[in-house]
Structure formats: C-alpha cells, structure tokens
Amino acid sequence: MCGIIGYTGKLAAAPVLIEGLKRLEYRGYDSAGLAVVADEHMYQVKSVGKVAQLEAVAGQQPELKKLAGCGIAHTRWATHGAPSTLNAHPHLDESGRFAVVHNGIIENYQELRKHLEGKGVHFRSQTDSEVIPHLIAGAYEGDLLSAVAAALKQLDGTYGIAVISSLEPGVVVTARKGSPIVIGLGEGENLVASDIAALLPYTRQVIYLNDGDIAAITADKVDLRNIQNVPVEREVAKIDWDAGQAEKGNYPHFMLKEIFEQPETIENAIRGRIDHEMGTAILNGMNLSPRELALINRIVIAGCGSSMHAGMLGEYYFEDIAGISTSVEQAAEFRYRNPIIEPNTLVIPISQSGETARSEERRVGK
C-alpha cells in the first residue's frame, strides 16, 4: 500500500524523491516524508496529506533543492498509529544519524519496543516501523549493510525497506521480505523503489530483489547479498513499459489488476489492525467511544465505483457479524436525495483517494 523511493547520485536528491513519490500516488496514502544525507548531515521533512503538501514544506528549506547526495522518501497508509507527522516516515534513531522507510508489518514490534525502552531508548511515534532505526543504531559497528542485516534478523513479519545514514553519505541500503523492492541502475546514479513507476524517468535497467535479499547501493555500485551476508547475483531486466503500463503491472487493464489484487488488498487492510494477544481491533482514527458504538442501530454506506463495491462487502460483514441493519448508497445519487437518517445511524462515506467529489459533497452536507 505504501510507496518507497531512494536515490544516490549526482543530482539533488530531494527533487528526485518528490517526483518519485508523485509517481507512486496512485497507491493511496495519508502522509509522506523524505530524508536526505548531504555533507554528513541528515535533513528530514514530513507532512500529513498529499505529496504536494510535502513539496511545499520542503520548499521552506531552499537548500534541499540543491543538495546532491542520497536520500529516501515514503508515502504512508496508516496501520500502526494514526496519520500524523510523527507517525509519517522516515523514522530516525535517537541520534538522528539513521533514517528508515518501511513497507510491511513488524509482528513482534511490541516485544522489540519494550526491549529497547528497557535499554533507555525513547520512541517518538506509535508505529511498528520505528523499532528498525533503533535496532540498526544499536548494531552499527562501522558498516551500514551489516547493521541493517543484524537488525532485520530480529524482525518477525514483512518488510521492504530503504536506509540511509549520515555516517555513510552516498549509501542507500535496501532489503525485502514479503514487500516488493526493485533497484534501478543509472549512469552515475542508482535508485531503489517499491514500484517500477518511480524509476522510469531515470532508467530502464532494473534488478528485482528476492525475499531475503539485502543490498547497499552507491552512485556507481550495487553490493547485493542475502540475509546470511553471502554475495548473490540477480538478473538485470530491461523495462520497455511506459509509466501508464508500469502502474498496471503485468495486467492489460486496471480492472483485472484490481480483481487479482483483492486477496493482497484485504490482507493489507487487516494487517496491524488486529491485536491477537488482546483479541481486539485497533481502529486508529476512530473517534467514537465504545458507548457511542453500542448505540448504533443502523449503518448507511455511501460511495462511488469500487468504493461502493467495498461498501457492499461491508454490508454483509456488518449484518452478519455485528447484527446491525446496513444499506449501501450510490454517493452520486445520495447527495441529491433527502435521505431519512434516524438517530443512532452511522453514515460511512467511502473514497479510495479521500477526494471523491460526490462522497465529499454529501459528507459536508451539500
């Protein structure tokens, strides 16, 4: 669900990263951020909302447009922790020398967090991802690749990550387990991304990482290993797609892509929202109290297109599991009606982008 882009080379890193994030916007997200290492200094910018907002915030630091070096950036879809600047990636260790962007779910993050807090580490966010930079900082002994490998061995779950450090300017370390990562090979520059679409303006030569692969990339070199630190070779593939085709992957059109991605989409939606130890759901951003939820006796869902179809699935679950009468409305028609909304009715407008006009207009009462 989230997007990752990393760059090391001759260009100013921040503009490359922001352009890469724009090419990943179709994946959906609620916040964004970037970190750049230049002159052995770590620069970081994060914001809630669209990449355009991140670009505006970054514009308040004019030096970012000029700093050549390496950097990483990320668009986040909240799982652990609500959408906020603190919870947005990249996450840094306490010293501010290691920055990490992460896709996936760290299933044992609570155990790792308690262990780190017991050693005096202070956390800034509510996310599972923040344990990673702290683990890397604790394992660092002069080689970033080795420190990242040591940290990853402690993780249970899935990850696609990119890491930079002010201690090793020009180096981006990346790794994958269950979350896609692809390296783009340029001339005097190299990139890493979660999706080929972010790489196409700069290169058509790519290396797909396998699960368990870890790589350190510089502007002119890729050091690729497995998690046991054994050097490995991967085929260099040539991409002849355009940007539109890249977004569709290997599918002829988006409809087929969305159909076959449904199992993965459902899994991603559930990840991080179930506390198996407590047997409860984690609903970050839900502002209704348990008392208010108990008073709900009817649910109305409004959406357009695929959002409406998601609502239709929700209708079955609400009625089957919660025993609450539920109806689904076409948002384009709902806004022009004067629907009967009784007391204790929960209305849920759905929009994949958060900007669907019909859902938004009904939400604000137009």
Q: Where are the regions that the model predicts?
A:
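Internal active-site segments that recognize and position negatively charged phosphoryl groups
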Residues: H253, K257, S307
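Glycine-rich phosphate-binding loops that contact phosphosugars or nucleotide phosphates
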Residues: A294-K366
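Conserved short alpha-helical segments that host acidic/polar catalytic motifs at enzyme active sites
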Residues: M1-K248, P252, E261, E267-V300, ...
